[in-house]
Amino acid sequence: MLQKIRFSKRSYFLRQIYRIASEFGFNPIALILSITGIPLYIYQAIQFRLKNTFSESNFSVSSLSPCLKDRYQGDSHIDKHYFYQDLWAARKVYQNNPANHIDVGSRIDGFIAHLLTFRKVEVLDIRTIDSQIDGMTFRQADLMQFDSLPIAEYDSVSCLHALEHFGLGRYGDSIDPDGHIKGLKSLIMLLKPNGKLLLSVPIGRERIEFNAHRVFAVSTIVDLTSSNLDMISFSYINDNGEFYEDMSIQEIPTMNYGCGLFEFTKK
């Protein structure tokens, strides 16, 4: 077990180095895969040109646009946190079929897109959205500020992989070490009594990796919500990107950077 934890930490450290390098425009994995793909690309380009001479179609090669790394990536480029959490939450909303649903800060091109296939949804985000999307109503709002928020208006609220960013300045929000606490209070305020909250956050050894995110101990989320919310289900994604649904919080393995998926009902 200790060896697995050490491997997990090393793996996470390497991913962090990769992420930081990518922030500065350098993607070492993409570079290696692209260089690896050059000989095959040249061979296939020549092969295609020769075969195209005898083709019945009228397509001609107008320019070269190399895609060198796609064949090597498989599903390794998929962020398992977002992939599983978006499916998990969309299925919950579909099953619960609330009269109205509002989302705070989740990905438009993931979870919100899933929801829009079967219902209308309202979205709050501190960032602006320029696109007009049928079925989606957008309002710019800072969830650390309570004065502009509707109170007890929604049957269902979601906030996926967003709460951990509140107050760290990453998305243009103000610096506030208690931003996650204020944000969680706002989520609870939005809910009607007996309304459902779907929440996902990074879980593991509690810490801040400034200004990327917080990582929460599961007990912290439980403590912050226990007076206003009842937890009705808990699922998680472990360090290996494996999804475990409807688990007991008493049986959570040690993780460095997992994802906790919480389903609550407002008291």
What are these regions (language model features)?
Residues 95, 100-146:
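Class I SAM-dependent methyltransferase SAM/SAH-binding core
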Residues 1-65:
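Membrane-proximal basic amphipathic "stem/tether" segments
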Residues 158-163:
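A conserved beta-strand element that flanks and buttresses the S-adenosyl-L-methionine
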Residues 175-196:
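A short glycine-rich, Lys/Arg-flanked "PGG" loop and its adjoining helix->strand segment in the class I
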Residues 48-99:
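Class I SAM-dependent methyltransferase Rossmann-like catalytic core
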Residues 218-267:
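Class I S-adenosyl-L-methionine
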Residues 178, 199, 204-223:
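Acceptor-substrate binding/catalytic loop of class I
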Residues 146-157:
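A short acidic, Gly/Pro-enriched loop at the edge of an enzyme's catalytic core
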